[in-house]
């Protein structure tokens, strides 16, 4: 699955030289990537056979075989398309630092075990790709090294996040 990222250390630019006394670091970063999630065990999409006990015929015992599950040849991996943009910063020789990040993730072809009509299916449920979900939010963290001596240090850290989850699409294949 492909991915790409880039960063720009703004604090190293010539136009930022006048800020070196208080601005230790400033970096803008962004990334985009696609991830895969199989989300189901091997052979869930295939017609497999399983034993259904034994059948006596003419004094002999025969193993009975039949389908183990509903077949779904259209079942495929979930795909997550993710992008982030963030800002990392540090002030006063790194004594106050943090980051801000906005993210957006769209998970397509969600996999789940869903009810199936009988007939035409042999079993009451089947694995299907049925929907799309979008997650987005904002994350931040700020750290302050309040006291830093040879024998003692005291650090304050604040973290926070928001998150929004939304089903964009939910439908079964007809």
Give residue spans per PLM region.
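Extracellular/periplasmic, surface-exposed regions of secreted and cell-surface proteins
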Residues: 1-174
